[in-house]
Amino acid sequence: MHHVRQENLPFVGSSHEFVGAEHADTGVSVFLFHGKPGSGPGPHRHPYDEIQFILEGRGMWTVNGQTFEGGAGDIFVIKAGEIHSFKAVGDSPLIQVDVHLSPRFIQENL
């Protein structure tokens, strides 16, 4: 068992980053995104699936050219290779847990 405190994780951009291979020798990486309104990553893709659990706030997602609005309680499953981006919308932060099915974070920015 590994115990990692959130405050000990690197904070990059708008996310605490738990990279499985570095923090617990495990096959997944998890990011806690805490984005202010208007923030979010531009178009990118990963060579593995990603599952996003929306905890608070609202956002707009674009996946392979289709746009979706979502909020607390929604789950997005983004398949390997799908081009996607999202940004927080509204007046409150967007908080989500992003599970990357890979021990290492791999992202191609487009």
Protein language model features and the residues they cover:
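A generic "binding-loop/recognition-motif" signal
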Residues: 47, 66, 82-83, 92, ...
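A short, N-terminal "cap"/entry segment at the start of jelly-roll beta-barrel domains
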Residues: 1-28, 109-110
